[in-house]
Regions:
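Small/aliphatic-rich secondary-structure junction motif
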Residues: 30-48
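A glycine-rich helix N-cap at a beta->alpha junction
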Residues: 54-83
Length: 118
């Protein structure tokens, strides 16, 4: 099974990105072989910027995205959203990939085709 997460909010200031990544990690941990794709759009694109520093004992979305990648998940970042925020591909954490809406559409098609509709 594949689960596609489309995140739009900034990495900090709300907990939507944090909670989406928590759910992604739990799916990967509890269901080996569960494919997870995280697509970062809008302000969420900055979640994949490498080298973020957060206060001690505060969640770090870089580490959370890295955990998704280490478990063979995908992290795709909207290229247009990156451009609007001055992010270059080399600014991203290792494993995150600049992407497009066309790729998101393909991921959605794969997700829909694999969905359990019973």
């Amino acid at each position: 099974m594949t689960t596609l997460f489309i995140l739009n909010d900034p990495p900090y200031g709300t907990e939507r990105v944090y909670n989406g990544l928590r759910l992604a990690a739990n799916l990967q941990r509890l269901d080996e072989g569960h494919d997870v794709v995280v697509f970062l759009m809008g302000d969420a694109a900055s979640a994949a910027k490498a080298g973020q520093s957060v206060p001690n004992d505060y969640y770090n979305v870089n580490k959370m995205l890295g955990n998704v990648l280490r478990r063979d998940g995908k992290v795709l970042v909207c290229g247009t959203c990156m451009d609007a925020r001055g992010l270059a591909p080399e600014d991203l954490i290792d494993g995150a990939q600049r992407s497009t809406l066309d790729e998101l559409t393909q991921e959605r098609i794969v997700f829909t085709a694999n969905a359990d509709v019973s």
